[in-house]
Regions:
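Exposed beta-strand face motif in extracellular beta-rich ectodomains
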Residues: 133-139
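Conserved structural position at the C-terminal beta-strand
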Residues: 143-145
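Short glycine/proline-centered coil/turn motifs in the loop regions
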Residues: 81-85, 96
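Secondary-structure boundary elements
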Residues: 166-217
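His-Asp-centered catalytic microenvironments across diverse enzyme cores
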Residues: 263-266, 270-366, 370
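Sec-dependent signal peptide cleavage junction
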Residues: 19-37
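Hydrophobic/aromatic-rich core segments of domains that either
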Residues: 227-293
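Short, compositionally biased P/S/T/A/G/V-rich stretches that sit at domain boundaries
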Residues: 31-68, 313
Length: 425
């Protein structure tokens, strides 16, 4: 689907725009521009490529650069003419698109740090940026000349680069999905799990909160939650798995919803990417295949999102939860089996069983116990001819079980109530 360009480092589509930018900005720029300069003696005096704006109050903004090389810094010399020579310059967070697609995603978070900061007053300024994937990068530069009343004047340029040593994001995704197809049985669950595990091996969380795209995740090996979500979404889409972004605007976090075997599930690759092993189970899959209810235990703001009308990826099943599928949920449930059966044998019709993980934080214990409660309700209990349902208590660290008759309506009522409960210590 993605055509590889034969020409290396081809430069195309130079777009020049002026006026107030309507493009939202992200933050991480000039840490890469730490070596930028405003000293004319340190600048290159001749450049191969350039783009400039139309005049505004007599001021013209110009950007110049030489042949870019993937994996190396490209210097962008930004200057202005016709004004006071007391200019303030800014570089926006670059955006990236696969070749021939022209569907751009900000490489970095445009709302933070140097991306939103103008330089001190100067005649010109050098910005630097390293391109890391074959494709098209969009660069935007701004100037202010307050003396002449020029604000937010912009020049924008697209630069297409190609190098087989630096594949496009699309090529990286397609190669991963091709390998996934060879190493799994082709089911939605197996593909989603394989791609989840593959992605976690590719990158680390960017604690500087700068890199926030699939490009940064797959080529810079760093990213925020937005990078994890974006990269995983591209992988799932390429594998034929329906997915959507779940954005917790209350907590400032994002993750994926995916549709496996016709049902929606929540998965948080960012929180699964951990080296911790504090809780005696595989934490790298704790947030794979959760219900909305359980995910809200980790991300409290999600409780207000998934309960709102119009929410489109409602997730209520644990059938394709990682621990349910690999058998750990059943093992955990069996740890409570003797205690539950002992109460049943004693003729109790309603009782509580303390959990073994009460010391864990709610985002850990609550999710684990929700999965255990699901497994408990898949088990068969000896209680004469009566049914037994088990749930987790919303406020205390225990499971509770209740015996009831054969009424299907009553059974559904109880199970629905308990599955809707949250678990908190």
């Amino acid at each position: 689907m993605i055509k590889r360009k034969l020409a290396t480092f081809m430069l195309t589509l130079i777009l020049v725009m002026t006026g107030v930018s309507m493009i939202k900005v992200i933050s991480y720029a000039q840490e890469e521009s730490a070596g930028s300069s405003t000293n004319p003696k340190e600048r290159v005096t001749e450049y191969k490529y350039s783009a400039e704006s139309d005049p505004q109050n007599g001021v013209v903004l110009k950007v110049e650069w030489n042949e870019p090389k993937l994996g190396e810094n490209t210097t962008f010399h930004v200057s202005a003419d016709g004004g006071s020579d007391r200019y303030l310059f800014r570089m926006d967070a670059p955006s990236y698109s696969n070749p021939d697609e022209y569907s751009f995603e900000s490489v970095a978070d445009p709302s933070r740090g140097a991306w939103i900061q103008y330089t001190d007053e100067c005649e010109s300024h050098d910005f630097e940026f390293t391109m890391t994937a074959s494709g098209v990068y969009n660069f935007r530069f701004y100037v202010m000349d307050k003396t002449l009343g020029v604000y937010y004047m912009r020049v924008s340029t697209n630069i297409q680069v190609s190098d087989r040593a630096y594949p496009s994001v699309g090529d990286i995704v397609n190669a991963a999905v091709k390998k996934c197809s060879k190493e799994t049985d082709g089911s939605d669950y197996e593909k989603a799990l394989w791609l989840h595990d593959w992605l976690l091996k590719q990158l680390d969380y960017d604690h500087s909160l700068k890199w926030s795209s699939a490009e940064s995740a797959l080529t810079r090996k760093l990213g925020t939650c937005q990078a994890y979500e974006s990269a995983y979404s591209k992988l799932l889409t390429a594998a034929g798995i329906t997915n959507a972004e779940t954005r917790d605007t209350y907590d400032g976090h994002t993750w994926n919803a995916m549709k496996l075997d016709g049902k929606w599930y929540q998965v948080d690759c960012t929180w699964d990417d951990t080296k911790d092993n504090y809780y005696n189970f595989d934490q790298t899959h704790l947030y794979f295949g959760l219900t909305d209810e359980l995910m809200a235990l980790a991300h409290n703001g999600h409780d207000q999102i998934y309960t709102a009308s119009g929410y489109g990826t409602r997730s209520t099943s644990l059938a394709d939860n990682y621990f349910v599928r690999n058998g750990d949920a059943t093992k955990w449930a069996r740890a409570y089996a003797e205690r539950i059966q002992k109460n049943l044998n004693a003729g109790k019709t309603k009782f509580e069983v303390s959990t073994d993980n009460a010391s864990y934080p709610p985002s850990i214990s609550g999710i684990q116990n929700g999965i255990i409660a699901y497994a408990l309700n898949q088990m068969t209990w000896k209680a004469g001819s009566k049914k037994v349902a088990c749930g987790r208590n919303i406020h205390q660290a225990f499971f509770y079980c209740k015996i009831y008759g054969h009424s299907k309506a009553r059974e559904n009522s109880i199970c629905s109530k308990w599955r809707a409960c949250e678990f908190r210590k």
